[in-house]
Amino acid sequence: MRVVLKLGTSVLTAGTDRLHRPRLVDLMRDIAAVSAQGHEVVLVSSGAVTAGWEALGFPPRERTLAEKQLLAAVGQVQLMHLYTSLAELYGLRSAQLLLTADDFRERTRYLNARTTLEGCLSRGVLPVINENDTVAVEQIKVGDNDTLSAFVANLVEADLLLILTDAPGLYTADPRTHPDATLIPVVERVTPDIWALAGGAGSHRGTGGMHTKIQAAEIATRAGTPVVIAPGDLPEALRRVVDGEALGTRFLAHGTRLEARKRWILAEIAHGRLLLDGGAAQAVRERGSSLLPAGIRQVEGDFERGHTVRLLAPDGQELGRGLTRYRADDLRRVCGHHSREIEALLGYTYGEEAVHRDDLVLL
């Protein structure tokens, strides 16, 4: 089994202001035990900024982007040193990969990242992945490591994404304010009712909360990878989940495993939205047809040819994602028009489809 394991700041600090060394030892022992069983583990880890706080003695408060990037630069070295030392203690080698959204957005970089990860796993090396916070600005940030872990699970075609957190899983209500709230053991599909249970933001040290975890679950399960959200303070949580024990909340994968190109389309961050009319929405949803300009009612966002866009039904429901053949401004000029008018309106044509069905992933 190939598992992507995501560790958030709240798990790594055990609720304190510092990295909790005993917790890190336990987690690495768990990873080593699962690896010894023949499973492959990819680790997505937060904690760099906290490690930087700890190393430089900065007081815990909100900081500017430049200060956070400094802390991440210092802390990533400290964090990776800890992981390397602990991995060696249990007979494992480790490797570091720092990624940004562009590494998922641009196909060549996406393929290079996948090749590197496959090489690590084939040689028994534990990849440790974090977002490259020292260079990432808003335009190239994935945003949080929950979402990053879902993209990584998609990238390596993982059999399971395990997100360890400071909560036992997803509840029917916030258990802090609703004592009668109960744990939801299985989620068959992420629906508006599930989103309503997301609650607020995460810990003051991290960037995630239950909302980002549900978002990660939606991304991964759409691509065919099941997701488990479980408490990070449980002994041997990774091994127990891999062995089939029911811990936390399991989000079931739906649909078949997507082919590699369509996994990439789904992983890429969407640059815009196309609002379809009823006929086009029906043709795309029910017949798997390509999207023609005539079926587009509205174009939102600023994107270039080849970028990923969301396709929305008239009621706003997302039907799928696809690679657009035309840039946003040109699509605005041809939307609602017949395909034979494209060349007359634009002075060129890349074909009659706005999004070809081969470049389209239905959700």
Swiss-Prot record:
It is found in: Cytoplasm. Disulfide bonds: none annotated. Transmembrane segments: none annotated. Gene3D superfamilies: Acetylglutamate kinase-like (3.40.1160.10), PUA domain (2.30.130.10). Pathway: Amino-acid biosynthesis; L-proline biosynthesis; L-glutamate 5-semialdehyde from L-glutamate: step 1/2. It comes from the Bacteria. The keyword ATP-binding applies. It is an enzyme of class 2 (transferase). GO terms for cellular component: cytosol. The keyword Electron transport does not apply. SUPFAM superfamilies: Carbamate kinase-like, PUA domain-like. GO terms for molecular function: ATP binding; glutamate 5-kinase activity; RNA binding. Keywords: Amino-acid biosynthesis, ATP-binding, Cytoplasm, Kinase, Nucleotide-binding, Proline biosynthesis, Transferase. Belongs to the glutamate 5-kinase family. Catalyzes the transfer of a phosphate group to glutamate to form L-glutamate 5-phosphate. This is Glutamate 5-kinase. The lineage of its organism: Bacteria, Thermotogati, Deinococcota, Deinococci, Deinococcales.
